[in-house]
């Protein structure tokens, strides 16, 4: 997912504490749900499920991360992907193929008792489907957390909302949020402080990326940063073979973008991709209103509907009350 710019952005990542993260956060919903589905799993790689075999990893992730966000003074608004652009069709088709292949490899690993391989392939087979989206929105409604339906890419809409001042920062693991123009991007906002990287749990800290600092430090315009992304490869184009982020940066700064692209990707027109990053489809048709969480509704959905342990749900809801110094979750608002 996203664009591989890590190698040129390392110097511009600033560790931050949770205490400095208050304000409205435009959360890249699909990216966040994908994290929940890949990380919150059982030892054999299968996601958390209820007695009916329905996946619940994302619901657990939403509940506990949102509790944590609100405890820290973060007011989240989830931004869901809309219709994918035609530019993304090839990428989506390739991802589906890889997920299907991983699903078959998972079954083979289970049959031969290879738990480690089964876990790895199960994560690779993860998909955010319509049921995951619908149940996530249902829980967000009950929690009183607003969400926005983007016309296209959620990262683009989140970036736009920060540009407008409707959110303080965007939350996503994807660096293309910067290419879409997010002034402030936050990464690694996990409850546990850990992420799975190459199958291992590693400790991570919240980190901040400020677009103006990135552009100033790299001596680039945003248009040039997009060119770097196009050379490396994005969700909308495969990139130039053998060109990594550092090489792409040198090429763009030396004025060789068009020549290198013509050499490596003959016949490819970068203009539609650049235009999509610089002028993506976004909407102003949204309302940000945080409502009163429905305690009984949350319990009914999670405990009665999806077999969540009542004590876990109660403990999460009590954290709201402890934070507010009051007896009920509703009174927190």
Swiss-Prot record:
Segments for region (N-domain): 1-99
InterPro entries: 5-3_exonuclease_C_sf, Flap_endonuc, Flap_endonuc_arc, HhH2, PIN-like_dom_sf, XPG-I_dom, XPG/Rad2, XPG_CS
One GO process term, biological-process aspect: DNA repair
Residue ranges of the region described as Interaction with PCNA: 325-333
GO molecular function: 5'-3' exonuclease activity; 5'-flap endonuclease activity; DNA binding; magnesium ion binding
Binding-site residues, Mg(2+) 1: 28, 81, 153, 155
EC number: 3.1.-.-
Subunit: Interacts with PCNA. PCNA stimulates the nuclease activity without altering cleavage specificity.
Summary of the function given for this chain in its UniProt record: Structure-specific nuclease with 5'-flap endonuclease and 5'-3' exonuclease activities involved in DNA replication and repair. During DNA replication, cleaves the 5'-overhanging flap structure that is generated by displacement synthesis when DNA polymerase encounters the 5'-end of a downstream Okazaki fragment. Binds the unpaired 3'-DNA end and kinks the DNA to facilitate 5' cleavage specificity. Cleaves one nucleotide into the double-stranded DNA from the junction in flap DNA, leaving a nick for ligation. Also involved in the base excision repair (BER) pathway.
Stated family: Belongs to the XPG/RAD2 endonuclease family. FEN1 subfamily.
Cross-referenced PANTHER family: FLAP ENDONUCLEASE 1 (PTHR11081:SF9), FLAP ENDONUCLEASE FAMILY MEMBER (PTHR11081)
Protein name: Flap endonuclease 1
Originating species: Methanoregula boonei (strain DSM 21154 / JCM 14090 / 6A8)
């Amino acid at each position: 997912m996203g664009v591989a710019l890590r190698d040129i952005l390392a110097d511009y990542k600033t560790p931050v504490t949770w205490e400095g993260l208050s304000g409205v956060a435009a959360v890249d919903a699909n990216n966040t749900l994908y994290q929940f589905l890949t990380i919150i799993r059982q030892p054999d790689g299968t996601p958390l499920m209820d007695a009916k075999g329905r996946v619940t990893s994302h619901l657990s992730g939403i509940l506990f991360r949102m509790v944590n966000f609100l405890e820290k003074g973060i007011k989240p608004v989830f931004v869901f992907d809309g219709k994918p652009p035609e530019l993304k069709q090839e990428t989506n088709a390739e991802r589906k193929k890889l997920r299907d292949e991983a699903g078959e490899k998972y079954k083979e690993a289970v049959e031969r008792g290879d738990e480690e391989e089964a876990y790895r392939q199960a994560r690779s087979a993860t998909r955010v489907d319509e049921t995951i989206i619908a149940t996530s929105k249902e829980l967000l409604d009950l929690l009183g957390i607003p969400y926005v339906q983007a016309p296209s890419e959620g990262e683009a809409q989140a970036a736009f909302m920060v540009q407008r001042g409707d959110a303080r920062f965007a939350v996503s693991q994807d660096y293309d949020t910067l290419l879409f123009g997010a002034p402030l991007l936050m990464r690694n906002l996990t409850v546990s402080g850990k992420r799975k990287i190459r199958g291992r749990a590693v400790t991570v800290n919240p980190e901040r990326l400020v677009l103006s600092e990135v552009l100033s430090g790299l001596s680039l315009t945003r248009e040039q940063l997009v060119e770097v992304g196009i050379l490396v490869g994005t969700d909308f184009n495969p990139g130039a073979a053998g060109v990594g982020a550092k090489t792409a940066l040198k090429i763009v700064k030396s004025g060789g973008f068009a020549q290198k692209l013509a050499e490596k990707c003959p016949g490819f027109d970068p203009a539609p991709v650049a235009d999509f990053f610089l002028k993506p489809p976004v909407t102003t048709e949204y309302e940000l209103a945080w409502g009163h969480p429905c305690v009984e509704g949350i319990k009914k959905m999670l405990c009665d509907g999806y077999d969540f342990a009542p004590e876990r749900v109660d403990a999460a809801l009590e954290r709201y009350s402890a934070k507010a110094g009051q007896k009920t979750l509703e009174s927190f608002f």
